[in-house]
Amino acid sequence: MAKDKIVLAYSGGLDTSIILKWLQTERNYDVVCFTADLGQGDEVEEARVKALNTGAVAAYALDLREEFVRDYVFPMFRSSALYEGYYLLGTSIARPLIAKKMVEIAQKEGAVAVSHGATGKGNDQVRFEMTAYALQPDIVTVAPWRDWEFQGRADLEAFAHEHGIPVPTTKKDPWSTDANMLHISYEGGILEDPWAEPPAHMFKLTVAPEEAPDEAEYVEIEFLNGDAVAINGETLSPAALLDRANEIGGRHGVGRVDLVENRFVGMKSRGVYETPGGTLLYHARRAVESLTLDREVLHQRDALGPKYAELVYNGFWFAPEREALQVYMDHVAKAVTGTARLKLYKGNCIVAGRKAERSLYDKDLVSFEAGGDYNQHDAGAFIKLNALRMRVQARVEAKAGQKDKAGD
C-alpha cells in the first residue's frame, strides 16, 4: 500500500534533516522536500541534493527571488509598514511565499500534508500554517517541534546518529539566523539577554558603522507608481535593485536594528536585524511621498501602516483584511513617482534631496515673499474657527469655576 505524501519546507540543516527522517520513520510518510531560494546563498542546490540523500522521494529547489521582491516585498513597502516602529518584516514577509509554494507542490505531488521546522514558541509556525489553511482549507499540517518526544539537543543528535544523518562537528554559533534578500535576522542563544550587545563578528550584511568609509556616499533612487525602479540612473529588476541597495547600504553600516518585540504567540523576544537595502528604500520612498501625497492621504496611510505591519507579522498575508488594505495602499502608491537622494555615512541614512514632476510642494506658497495664492490675513480667521471648540470649553470651565468658588 502506497504511503501518504507530505511536503516539508527543508533548509538542509540538521533540524530539518532530522524532521525529514522523523516523518518517514515515526509518521510513515513519503517526504517531498522543498527549498526556496530567496537569496540566502549557494546552499539551495546543496540542500536539494542532501534531501534526496537523506531519503526524500522528491526534492524541489525553486528560485523565487524575483517573485519574492516583486509580489511580496514591494507591495509591503507601499504601505511603509514597520512593526512596532522598527522592524521591516524581513522574515515575516518571506513565510507566506514559502508556504504558498509548499501548498502548490503538495497539490502537484498529491500530498495530503505539509510540514515545517518552526518551533512551538515562535511566530513562523503561525505564518506557515495560516497560509496553508487559507490556500487549501483541508490540508493537514504537521509541526514536529510541537509533536515529537525529543527533550533537547542531545536527543536530536542521538536520533541523527541512529539514522546516519551527519552531525556538524564545528561549534555552532550561539544564536540562530534566518536570511533572505531583504534581511538577516539573529535571535536566541546569547541574544536572549536584552542587555548583551551583539558580538561584532555576528553581522554579515553590514560593516560596523565605526569601520565604514570616512567619506559619505550619495545615492539616487527613482520610484515609479510606488515602486523603486532605478538606482543612480540604472533601471533594474526588483530583485537586482534590492541586491544593489543591499550592497550600497551594507558598506556604510546602514540598516542594523536591535529590538525587543512582541510575538503573536504572547511572549516578548529580542531580535537583531540587518536590512541595509530595505532601509535605503524605506527612507527614499518616504522622501518622495513627502512631495507627492496629499496631507490627509499621507496621514491616513500612515495610520493604517501599523495595522498592515501587524497583519504581515502575525501571518495574515492571505487574510481578506490584508488584501483589502493592499487595494488602498496600491491606490495611494500610484502618486509616488519621483527621485530621492540619500547621503550614507557611518550607519546613517540621511535624505539629501527629493524631486518629483507632479510635486505638491509649491515654493511660491511657502515663500516669505509677498504674492501667490496664500493671503496671510486669512490665517487669523482660520485659526479662530479652529480654536472655536477650545474657546467654548474654556468659557464653560471658567463659568463652572466661578460657581465652585461661590459655593465655597
From Swiss-Prot:
Pathway: Amino-acid biosynthesis; L-arginine biosynthesis; L-arginine from L-ornithine and carbamoyl phosphate: step 2/3. This is Argininosuccinate synthase. Homotetramer. PANTHER family: ARGININOSUCCINATE SYNTHASE. Transmembrane segments: none annotated. InterPro entries: Arginosuc_syn_C, Arginosuc_syn_N, Arginosuc_synth, Arginosuc_synth_CS, Arginosuc_synth_type_1_subfam, AS_cat/multimer_dom_body, Rossmann-like_a/b/a_fold. The keyword Cell membrane does not apply. L-aspartate binds at T119, N123, D124. One of its GO terms (cellular component) is cytoplasm. It comes from Deinococcus deserti (strain DSM 17065 / CIP 109153 / LMG 22923 / VCD115). It is found in: Cytoplasm.
